[in-house]
Amino acid sequence: MLKMKNITKLFLYLNLCLTLLACSKISPKGEIEVKDVTVENFTKLNLKGDFKVFFAKGNQNLVSVETYPNVYKNLDIEVENGILTIEENRKTDQVDFYNITIFGKNDLNEVSLSDKVEMNVSGQVKTPEFSLHLKGNSKFMGAVIAPKSKIEMAEKSNANILGETKNLNLKLADSASIMAPYFYVENLEILSQNGASAGLNIDQEMKGTLENTSKLIFYGEPLNKLTKKDKASVENRKLK
């Protein structure tokens, strides 16, 4: 009976140690290195962590990571079903240099960012349908040209988009913000809640619902079919 108690205590102790290790943050060690990883074809990105990402079209599918050796080893990089996932196993702390460059043969049609990922797109993303999902403190900056677009943002995420789309389905929550006066939208369908805010250039029609203290600034002279609730606001401005 005593032996069984000792085994149980040992198991609980090991479990506690593993939990503490998983919760502890990784601090940089060693010298900054560049590690290149060749990956399979992808058209979707799923990125989670505290790093900056630069995406560009290229002749090969490659992920180039420039950071400290132990920080690099903390990353999971894999492609499954056309989705390139880059994710941290443990959170990082005080990493002063942590950049990832992604080269892809194909245009992206879906991007998902979470935690504190900051992503910049070189050139333009051209695709029949584009989806963007942001949460946490993530940020997206880039040009998008797509007949159909879907953007979902929550928490403190932020987006700055250029380009054009015929139909945009936009869902905002919490304090998410998209300020894109040079993103030309023909038709907008929006659901905005909490304290979210948006700024878009709309040509033909805008419809949907704004709730709580959410705010929409629009440029252009579209047909307005919006429903405002609570203290939500809609403002028309002219581009300077």
Mark where each language-model region is.
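Short acidic/polar N-terminal linker immediately downstream of export determinants
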Residues: 2, 8, 22-74, 83-103, ...
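Extended, compositionally simple hydrophobic/Ser/Thr-rich segments
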Residues: 43-55, 101-102, 107-239
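Bacterial N-terminal signal peptides
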Residues: 11-21
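Intrinsically disordered, low-complexity Ser/Thr/Pro-rich tracts
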Residues: 5-8, 12, 210
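Structured catalytic/translocation cores of nucleotide/phosphate-coupled proteins
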Residues: 1-4, 16
